[in-house]
Amino acid sequence: MGAKSKSSSTRFFMFYLILISLSFLGLLLNFKPLFLLNPMIASPSIVEIRYSLPEPVKRTPIWLRLIRNYLPDEKKIRVGLLNIAENERESYEASGTSILENVHVSLDPLPNNLTWTSLFPVWIDEDHTWHIPSCPEVPLPKMEGSEADVDVVVVKVPCDGFSEKRGLRDVFRLQVNLAAANLVVESGRRNVDRTVYVVFIGSCGPMHEIFRCDERVKRVGDYWVYRPDLTRLKQKLLMPPGSCQIAPLGQGEAWIQDKNRNLTSEKTTLSSFTAQRVAYVTLLHSSEVYVCGAIALAQSIRQSGSTKDMILLHDDSITNISLIGLSLAGWKLRRVERIRSPFSKKRSYNEWNYSKLRVWQVTDYDKLVFIDADFIIVKNIDYLFSYPQLSAAGNNKVLFNSGVMVLEPSACLFEDLMLKSFKIGSYNGGDQGFLNEYFVWWHRLSKRLNTMKYFGDESRHDKARNLPENLEGIHYLGLKPWRCYRDYDCNWDLKTRRVYASESVHARWWKVYDKMPKKLKGYCGLNLKMEKNVEKWRKMAKLNGFPENHWKIRIKDPRKKNRLSQ
């Protein structure tokens, strides 16, 4: 009985197990996903599946966060990356819905023999007596395809050797800045009004000689954001890479380094960049010694045929009587506060020479040609307004002479000049030394524009000390003509001044004087103090036995009879 009951239980359990297995199998065979049963039903499982898919990684580097508010929302941008090392690319590349492409622009290595002094030689053969001056090549990238069409340029600027106490003359730094400028200009070639942003990365920022502070949008730490003016930038690229050559103006094609610049396809002359508001400017401060010189300068500009505005900056040392004469000569007068040279000695000749920095505050003009008040202009030089800042004649070594300069007034530049004037040293304690450390990249003007009345090297001059007839401007060093008798150059009378003496050059200043209106000549008269000095120098020349025997000359200068009372 017990065995029968156990067998019955076993059969029942097996039947129950089979029944359950068949039911489970039926359910499994008839199961369908919900979204297949009814695709119109909004199933949470679909949303969950979509959000679980991996998204592309978005990269928003610092530079993009700084400029994205300036970029158009609807446009996809192409980014040009310059001087970014391969192992740093991931840190600067951007991605996302607004990024079309990251383009890496490579730089060719600089030649080993390319130095700053080879770009800025002491002297060039302007007259082509022995050879035609040429410039060494600064390799720039060849822009092709998408490389020549970017909306943003991101560039790491080299700052090795940077110091707040001096200018940075570095060829690699120049190459990087010129390459950035070239990339911007090429990108805007099809649309001159196009906006291209440049983000410079580096503590020293870009070269202000190429990228102006007026074009700076913002700065955050080592990031400098610029929106450059493409027309101005293009003009910079049309200039030689240094003072190794003078750029021709208004004569056929402008200077172009055609090996690596696509700009050669355009016959663009620099004269097309002439600014609308231009003027000549000079400065008088601390005394009235140069009042006559400034009047003669103004008259020489007018005698050359120029009708451009003439601005004279002056401090309180210039009397009302003198201001009347200066105004009659053609100067528009503006009063300024003089600026002391931080590194000059008290009561030295250059103690207040930094007052020249005030010319950058004349911001109602686009471009100025500054001329020292001891100059005369011999030929029309209005063409200078076609040159960019900073253009000047060479002085020595890699330096320019600040006696004549083409500059572009700017409030932010003046502020920067003032800020750095207390940090950057000056080799001569004056404005010229400081400006040469601030503007290390400059453009050479012809020596004919700023010919100095200096004859230190007798082997380079004839015995008569004549200057060439094709001069454009003469810089009167030494004792000034109006402080001598017109009969001869009184620089001959002093041993230390004889290097500045020349009868013919002295006479050229008096030709300008002779053409002045009579009412202006009185401002160039002799006073008692001046005459005593001249007579003292004549006696010294006699004691020294100088062979020219100028002390024997009978003075006929009419100013001697009509001596000024003061």
Curated annotation (Swiss-Prot):
Sites where the protein binds Mn(2+): D372, D374, H475
Domain of life: Eukaryota
Feature type site, description Important for catalytic activity: K356
Binding site for substrate: 372-374, 401-403, 428-432, 475-480
Primary location: Golgi
Co-factor(s): Mn(2+)
Enzyme Commission number(s): 2.4.1.-
One function term, GO molecular function aspect: glycosyltransferase activity
Membrane topology note: Single-pass type II membrane protein
Stretches that traverse the bilayer: 17-37
Sorted UniProt keywords: Cell wall biogenesis/degradation, Glycosyltransferase, Golgi apparatus, Manganese, Membrane, Metal-binding, Signal-anchor, Transferase, Transmembrane, Transmembrane helix
GO CC, alphabetical: Golgi apparatus; Golgi membrane
Functional description taken from the UniProt entry: May be involved in the substitutions of the xylan backbone in stem glucuronoxylan.
UniProt protein name: Putative UDP-glucuronate:xylan alpha-glucuronosyltransferase 5
Organism: Arabidopsis thaliana
